[in-house]
Amino acid sequence: MVSVSEIRQAQRAEGPATILAIGTATPPNCVDQSTYPDYYFRITNSEHMTDLKEKFQRMCDKSMIKKRYMHVTEEILKENPSMCAYMAPSLDARQDIVVVEVPRLGKEAAVKAIKEWGQPKSKITHLIFCTTSGVDMPGADYQLTKLLGLRPYVKRYMMYQQGCFAGGTVLRLAKDLAENNKGARVLVVCSEITAVTFRGPSDTHLDSLVGQALFGDGAAAVIVGSDPIPQIEKPLFELVWTAQTIAPDSEGAIDGHLREVGLTFHLLKDVPGIVSKNIGKALSEAFDPLNISDYNSIFWIAHPGGPAILDQVAQKLGLKPEKMKATRDVLSDYGNMSSACVTFHLDEIEKSVENGLKTTGKDLEWGVLFGFGPGLSLETVVLHSVAI
């Protein structure tokens, strides 16, 4: 008779979970950050708020963002004027948009990842879908399964309302699934659309205005599996270690609340300080076992958040400017896409491999993927690059 331990042993993969393919997508509507304040105050009928507009202009100028992509166009906003007010009941209008567009944008990213993977979609065994943009039943995971034509018995996991740290959370979950289910191939999708948070300005809620200056739309997908098939699957990054923690004394630092007016956004001014204060301990727990204490010796995949956060983290750790360059490039080209950001960054690193590098980690062996968001919660993923 076979023992339980023998069954468990047979169920486990031999090697570490590995990212096998990456895909990203954005809506076609591209917004120029330099002209966005004029557009934003005009479309929300707020041009009379001249002092607040000047303040918003400064926010946009300091954001280090050049452009963002948004599903919500001027035409859509004219059809749904309640979304342009600061606090008008508008959840129905927002939900009508996101329950359709979140899975649709996720599909675009997933199709690209599956194509790069090169295997039939019938080999996908698990699906993880993550979004902070709306809630519905059946969820976006179900809708994506239908849109992609995945097998009806694919094992699905739906993650709603996680926020900006979730790009690390989904990889942590995918790692556990891949390593504990021999032969598993996990499709991971993060899809974010700002239709749920867009609203007009208010001089009493400046942190909401910060969100209007930073957030953009995007979807990202990865295929994760252990024991890549030689000559068929191309390993990109191994997921070696993961952790999540709540930063002490950080309650209320970043909050989002779903209301009749949509998803409201709140953050404290000291978010950059809280993140930089706690990142050292998180990195120490991750890299001390590897005898790594020089964080300039690893490659970085950091959630961009905003320029002030990146500046304080770099200063705290003594990072060279090039360590955060790719993160700043993603912020510049796309804005803050919440959970999707870190995968866009991974995709940029993968593309740079074609430029004569020896490993998928910019010629470095080890790397960190670092995310932070509501809670304030921190996600840490240790990555191991793969020889090209």
Swiss-Prot record:
PROSITE patterns assigned: CHALCONE_SYNTH (PS00441)
Domain of life: Eukaryota
Pfam families named among the record's database cross-references: Chal_sti_synt_C (PF02797), Chal_sti_synt_N (PF00195)
CDD domains, per the entry: CHS_like
Reactions accelerated catalytically: (E)-4-coumaroyl-CoA + 3 malonyl-CoA + 3 H(+) = 2',4,4',6'-tetrahydroxychalcone + 3 CO2 + 4 CoA
Keyword Transferase attached: yes
Gene3D superfamilies: 3.40.47.10
Residues annotated as the enzyme's active site: 164
Involved pathway(s): Secondary metabolite biosynthesis; flavonoid biosynthesis
Keywords: Acyltransferase, Flavonoid biosynthesis, Transferase
EC number: 2.3.1.74
Coiled-coil residue spans: none
InterPro entries linked: Chalcone/stilbene_synt_C, Chalcone/stilbene_synt_N, Chalcone/stilbene_synthase_AS, Polyketide_synthase_type-III, Thiolase-like
Top-tier EC class: transferase
MF annotations from Gene Ontology: naringenin-chalcone synthase activity
GO terms for biological process, alphabetical: flavonoid biosynthetic process; polyketide biosynthetic process
Function as written in the Swiss-Prot or TrEMBL entry: The primary product of this enzyme is 4,2',4',6'-tetrahydroxychalcone (also termed naringenin-chalcone or chalcone) which can under specific conditions spontaneously isomerize into naringenin.
PANTHER family attached to this UniProt entry: CHALCONE SYNTHASE 7, HYDROXYMETHYLGLUTARYL-COA SYNTHASE
Family (UniProt): Belongs to the thiolase-like superfamily. Chalcone/stilbene synthases family.
Protein name as catalogued: Chalcone synthase
Organism, as annotated: Vigna unguiculata
